[in-house]
Structure formats: C-alpha cells, structure tokens
C-alpha cells in the first residue's frame, strides 16, 4: 500500500491517470520542496518502482516531497518511449533550444508544451517552486545535472556509485533539464538508472537517495 496524499491528478489522452503525490512533515512546517518524477519515457519503468517502494515503506521527512510516479502511463502501457501522440516528453518543454524535428522516437511535438503531460509538469513547477528536481530515467547508470545541482549530484553519486556526468553526451533540445535547470536555475538532476537491474538490487543501491532527500537535504 502506498502511503501518500494525492495532491493533484489529470487524465492522459488514453484516459490513464497521472498522480502528484505528497509527503510532508507531520507536526511542523517543511523546510524545502523536492520533486521526484518517474517514467518520463514509457519504456523506462524502474523510476516508478523506486518511488512506489519508498512510499510503501517511507520514513519521516523534514521536507515536502512531491512525487509523480509515472508521467507517461500511455507510453508505459505500450512499452514505448513516447506518449500516445508519439511525442518524446523530454523534448517537448518550452526551452529556448526547442526545435521542430522529424517524427520518430525523439520527436518533440508540433510545438513546445503541446502535450498534457508536459503541461502538468510545468504547472507543478510553477505552483510548488521546488528547490530540487530529480527525474528518473534509464539505462546509463550516471547522475546527470543541469543548473546549480553539482553538490546534490555528487551526493547522489556517493550514495549510488553512479558517476556524475555534466553532459549526457548527445543533444537534447527541449529537454526538461534545459528548461528547469539551465533556464529557470532550479537544481535539476537526471538520474539514469542501470538497464534491467534486479529490483532488490536497484532498491538497495538507490534507497539512500530517499533518506537523503527526506532527512538531510
């Protein structure tokens, strides 16, 4: 069972729900706000597993923790990278470097923020103004960051053993990291989980991140 409050929700094109879940301190004001989002790409499901595992076994927190376990349920249902409109959500943000590209796995949409999933995430950023954002991807086993997030990236690297990489190694026009980290100056981490890691090992490697976000950050 997942123990968290439903803060907001929307429906996708195919009628699936996207949930924003919240955990806050029980008896005092929160100190910082952290947003953690999984399954931006539908064929990268392990972020949802980690979030749900934490929320089923969570500890107390001094911070306000916001979770989107699965941003792209339509893509996940079809085990594909893109959403129901065949748009790569991580190329659909209204960053200055967004560009109209050929249709395919990396297609960023006909215009920036054309997708309901993207619009929901932008709303959350504007409504809750997080101090730190982490998105969970696969399969490179690295900690990539945008904006003023170097120290947080290094801490997560120390916890997981994944290397810190300031660049993912290829162009990402219209990416979430560029939009939030570089242009909005919000510390933004793209945590690349390993490919097809056994679930128990994946949790053991990454559970310290949630303790850090709840108690230390």
Which residues make up each language-model segment?
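Short, surface-exposed beta-strand/loop micro-motifs that present aromatic residues
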Residues: 17-26, 176-182
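Short glycine- and acidic-rich boundary segments immediately preceding or forming the N-terminal edge
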Residues: 1-22
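Generic hydrophobic alpha-helical segments
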Residues: 20, 117, 121, 206-209
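A residue-level signal for conserved active-site and pocket-lining positions in enzyme catalytic cores
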Residues: 15, 89, 191
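Glycine-/small-residue-rich active-site loops that bind phosphorylated ligands and cofactors
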Residues: 42-43, 198
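Active-site/substrate-binding loop(s) of hydrolase catalytic cores
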Residues: 30-35, 44-55, 59-170, 186
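Active-site-adjacent mobile loop/cap segments within catalytic or ligand-binding domains
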Residues: 171-217
């Amino acid at each position: 069972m997942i123990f968290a409050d439903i803060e907001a929700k929307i429906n996708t094109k195919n009628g699936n729900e996207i949930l924003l879940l919240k955990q806050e301190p029980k008896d005092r004001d929160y100190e910082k706000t952290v947003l953690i989002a999984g399954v931006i790409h539908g064929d990268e499901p392990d972020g949802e597993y980690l979030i749900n595992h934490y929320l089923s076994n969570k500890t107390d927190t001094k911070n306000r923790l916001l979770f989107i376990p699965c941003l792209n349920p339509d893509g996940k249902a079809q085990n594909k990278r893109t959403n129901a409109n065949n748009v790569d959500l991580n190329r659909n943000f209204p960053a200055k470097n967004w560009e109209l590209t050929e249709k395919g796995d990396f297609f960023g949409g006909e215009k920036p923020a054309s997708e309901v999933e993207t619009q929901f995430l932008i709303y959350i950023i504007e409504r809750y103004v997080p101090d730190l954002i982490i998105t969970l991807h696969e399969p490179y086993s690295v900690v990539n960051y945008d904006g003023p997030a170097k120290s947080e990236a290094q801490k997560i690297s120390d916890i997981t053993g994944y290397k810190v990489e300031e660049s993912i190694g290829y162009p990402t026009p219209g990416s979430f990291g560029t939009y939030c980290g570089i242009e909005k100056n919000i510390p933004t981490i793209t945590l690349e989980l390993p490919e097809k890691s056994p679930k128990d090992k994946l949790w053991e490697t990454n559970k310290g991140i949630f303790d850090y976000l709840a108690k230390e950050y």
